[in-house]
Amino acid sequence: MATFHFDLVSPEKLTFSGDVDQVDVPGVEGDFGVLAGHAPVVAAIRPGILTITTGGTPQKIIVLGGLAEVSEKGLTVLADVATSIQELDRAQFADTIASMEAKLAEKEGSELDKAIERLDHFKSIQSQLNTTALH
């Protein structure tokens, strides 16, 4: 399988840089996979699980929004937050969801809609974390 260069950057660090077979990205308009030779595109990403496949081995990383750019040079993801599943404190993640739920009562209108959407994304990540495929 042909490979391409992939960089995953967050404000804290360069999380990943190297040649990969495939990257599956949680896009705002829907999830999408990137392979070598993918057409150029810029897309917003939503909170979700990004999967990097190298040599047939998947590596899963939680991203909490950002931007993905596919160019002739490869794929670059600028993530608001990027944490490998192994590094995630699941109890803290559950506490974050509980806190988000508690704060919903303080929101109104479009602010409430955005908060509900973000909460739904976090709950989706939590659900995926609880599946055996990620362990």
Swiss-Prot record:
Q: Where in the cell is it found?
A: Cell inner membrane
The UniProt GO MF terms for this protein read:
ATP binding; proton-transporting ATP synthase activity, rotational mechanism
Alphabetized Pfam families for the sequence: ATP-synt_DE_N
* Keyword Nucleotide-binding (UniProt): no
Give the top-rank taxon of the lineage listed in the UniProt record for this protein: Bacteria
Reply yes or no: does the keyword S-adenosyl-L-methionine apply: no
For this UniProt entry, what's an example GO CC term? plasma membrane
Give coiled-coil spans as residue ranges.
Answer: none
* Family matches, as InterPro entries: ATP_synth_F1_dsu/esu (IPR001469), ATP_synth_F1_dsu/esu_N (IPR020546), ATPsynth_dsu/esu_N (IPR036771)
**Keywords for this protein:** ATP synthesis, Cell inner membrane, Cell membrane, CF(1), Hydrogen ion transport, Ion transport, Membrane, Transport
Query: What is the membrane topology here?
Result: Peripheral membrane protein
Quaternary organization: F-type ATPases have 2 components, CF(1) - the catalytic core - and CF(0) - the membrane proton channel. CF(1) has five subunits: alpha(3), beta(3), gamma(1), delta(1), epsilon(1). CF(0) has three main subunits: a, b and c.
The entry's function note states: Produces ATP from ADP in the presence of a proton gradient across the membrane.
Annotated family: Belongs to the ATPase epsilon chain family.
| Name the record gives this protein | ATP synthase epsilon chain 1
* Source species: Nitrobacter hamburgensis (strain DSM 10229 / NCIMB 13809 / X14)
